[in-house]
Swiss-Prot record:
Transmembrane segments: none annotated. Belongs to the dGTPase family. Type 2 subfamily. Keywords: Hydrolase. This is Deoxyguanosinetriphosphate triphosphohydrolase-like protein. PROSITE patterns: HD (PS51831).
Length: 428
């Protein structure tokens, strides 16, 4: 393996759960070792079917809404790009953070967080459903790439550091925690793979690369959801300068983010309103000049939020290359408050729209009805990848997990096609 300036990662970080033989199809004399292990991992994520399916999964509005929709796939590409730039500034391996950005939503079901809510309702008695835990399950089990010695899938068989970089919430489900990273509590669960990835890691502490990915995710969707809202006419940035509107945003933000004070959120709204790049957007009208002003705004905000975290982290950790548990990412509260205000803009003017809420209710009903139909007719209703797992499952919880895995893998187009064709029978 060729050395790089990121050689502060060691063999433990680069270890794979299942040892792999050398490639056998290379021409004699061909150099097959010019990529790092993390570059290979990034390629595995980039080429996997689960990533491609994100093109037909909702980010905020549906993937078939408008001419230039943001989907879970385009969002993941944006997170990967922001994270990669931050990694370079922090001395983390950029391929490692890049792949974490690509994979961070790979477990999302149809209809994004709304679909996640529906599947969690269906599976609540058997471990629930959480997109981040589904990420881990896809990467370590469901996505076909490598088999272990017993013929069982090891998923993409990514390195330990790569899997950890995708893990925002490195803990199991508990009553106190709505978010979690691993499914456990049923036969043949994901606990052994989770234990292997987290071997020697501080309890409940995400690695630095995962923290960078998480902040890149926050930056991407806060800025770009607002951009999409402005283009659609649902958001007018001039509301930031309105005292009543700013107060409403601050109240929403304080309720959603208890670590942020109301007055800090109010001050953040004022700072945003006073930025020249915000004022330049004004009342967006779709002209070339307006589009350029909006694109400049998004570029400057992404840079502001990403660079603030790099600078603050460097002030604490110094200038050395950083990896895994060398440091935590330090994000100034001032910047966290600004990102929170942008999130609340999208929440108030897009996600809370009555028509949007009705669409979401219909989506959840559709998922519930498909789940009933698949369950009633399983294993015959399941894909060849999932039917044997259902037949081999030892109890209803494990069998339901297989049905959930199949639904989570659907694109929205396929889910709707299955829904139209279903012939549900009541459960016995």
């Amino acid at each position: 393996m060729n050395a790089t300036q990121y050689d502060h990662y060691d063999d433990f970080d680069r270890e794979r759960l299942v040892p792999e033989p050398a490639k056998s199809a290379a021409l004699p004399g061909t150099d097959t070792e010019h990529r790092t292990d993390f570059a290979r991992d990034r390629a595995r994520v980039l080429h996997c079917a689960a990533l491609r399916r994100l093109a037909d999964k909702t980010q905020v509005v549906g993937p078939r809404h408008g001419d230039n929709p943001r989907t879970r796939l385009t969002h993941s590409l944006e997170v990967a790009q922001i994270g990669r730039g931050m990694a370079i500034g922090l001395g983390c391996d950029p391929d490692l953070v890049d792949l974490a950005g690509l994979a961070h939503d790979i477990g999302h079901p149809p209809y994004g967080h709304n679909g996640e809510r529906a599947l969690n309702e269906i599976a609540k008695a058997f471990g629930g459903f959480e997109g981040n835990a589904q990420n881990f399950r896809i990467l370590t089990r469901l996505e076909p790439k490598v088999l272990d010695a017993d013929g069982r899938s090891a998923g993409l068989n990514l390195t330990r550091a790569s899997l950890d970089a995708v893990t925002k919430y490195p803990w199991r489900r508990t009553e106190e925690r709505r978010k979690f990273g691993f499914y456990v509590g049923f036969p043949d669960d994901d606990g052994p793979a989770a234990d292997w990835v987290r071997d020697g890691a501080p309890v409940d502490r995400p690695c630095l690369e995962a923290q960078v990915m998480d902040w890149a995710d926050d930056v991407a969707y806060s800025v770009h959801d607002v951009e999409d809202g402005v283009i659609s006419g649902r958001i007018d940035l001039r509301v930031l300068a309105d005292a009543d509107a700013a107060e409403s945003l601050a109240q929403l933000g304080a309720a959603a983010f208890p670590s942020l004070a109301h007055d800090d959120l109010l001050a953040a709204a004022q700072r945003l309103s006073e930025m020249p790049v915000v004022a330049a957007v004004g009342k967006y009208d779709g002209t070339l000049a307006a589009s350029v002003a909006l694109k400049r705004l998004t570029s400057e905000l992404v840079g502001r939020f990403a660079n603030a975290a790099i600078t603050e982290t460097r002030a604490v950790a110094g200038d050395r290359p950083l990896k895994r548990f060398d440091s935590d990412l330090v994000v100034p509260d001032l910047v966290r408050a600004e990102v929170a205000v942008l999130k609340m803009l999208a929440l108030q003017f897009i996600m809370s729209d009555h028509q949007h809420l009705q669409v979401q209710a219909d989506q959840r009903t559709r998922i519930h009805e498909v789940a009933l139909a698949l369950w009633a007719q399983a294993p015959g209703s399941l894909d060849p990848q999932f039917a044997p797992e259902f037949a081999a499952a030892g109890d209803d919880g494990a069998r339901l997990r297989v049905v959930i895995d199949q639904i989570a893998s659907y694109t929205e187009t396929r889910l709707e096609r299955v829904h139209e064709a279903r012939s549900p029978r009541p459960l016995e």
